[in-house]
Amino acid sequence: MDVTEKVNLVLRPPTEEVVTQEELLELFKTNSKPKHYIGIEISGFLHLGSLISTSFKINDFVKAGVDCTVFLADWHTLLNEKLGGSFETIRKVSKYYDDAFRLVCPKANIVLGTDLYDSKKEYWSELVQIAKHMSLARTMRTLTIMGRSENDEKVDLAKLIYPAMQATDIHSLDLDIVHAGMDQRKIHMLVKDVFPKMKWKVPVAVHHKLLPGLAKPPEEKPSGEVVKMSKSDPNAGIFIHNSDDEIRTKIKKGFCEEGRTENNPILEIAKHIVFHEFDTITIERPEKFGGNVSYDNFESLESDFLQKKLHPTDLKQSVGESLVKIVSPVREKLVLSNELSDLIKNNLVFDRRH
């Protein structure tokens, strides 16, 4: 595979941004096996965004010859008070995440945060070094990576450690490529600003599109801001453990205004999930409504939807069936005990209240 093909794999949707493409091109020219990571907080049930979309992108990196790592950030999860702030619960749920990513990304390395910190005695001294290059104001601005407001005056001291730890993770893993959803952009920009001053390796940053929730987006949200699929709201997205009928029903109820292409979750799923997995989407409909039609690229489907040649009901039916084909094999192989399921459910109630 030549360098251009590798770059195109990285740029493939759901990728939204590469900082920078020139650096990525040069990296592939000089490094036959660059090191990648994506950090994952261990929180609720895995869904279409947190497992499927993320794994599709990881597998693109693998195809491009990249050495990929899924970093299960157990200590970051504790700092962010997920799963009730119980480290015992976090450790139990981390096994579920480990199993899931090994299943969907079989060629990726899985690293638990605790294991990294136990194996690298210099980690904490490096954490202090990078913290000395971070002002309190900039640290506060990066709190959005945790889903927190940068204006939160009641934030506890522990949460302020989170951004510095994430930056130190990147250095400790000796990474060439850092990968995350767009919500992690601020920490990656901090890394690209601070690491050169410390004479540390500066990685390329790759950010993928966050899948939106299925509900109609709030009108007051600024243009381009995404209400992402939530692990704590059972009605907000497609979860790996939803049955086939639940998947179809959720898609059927999802927001998909006729002719509207902006902030349309069903179109986003078609683009970033369905077309990633399948070369063609076939819309089945009666002859009186135009008969069956197939699309071999998202742009033509989007164009027909915009011109109201493709009705939301028909699009939803096709997307729902496609998702069943994608999710059901994962659901059937990913074991989730009743005990662990109840543990996650109970702690999600706690997370929503705090």
Where are these regions (language model features)?
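Divalent metal-coordination and catalytic microenvironments
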Residues: 47, 101, 226
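Short glycine- and acidic-rich boundary segments immediately preceding or forming the N-terminal edge
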Residues: 1-18
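The substrate-binding groove and active-site-proximal loops of carbohydrate-active enzymes
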Residues: 44, 84-89
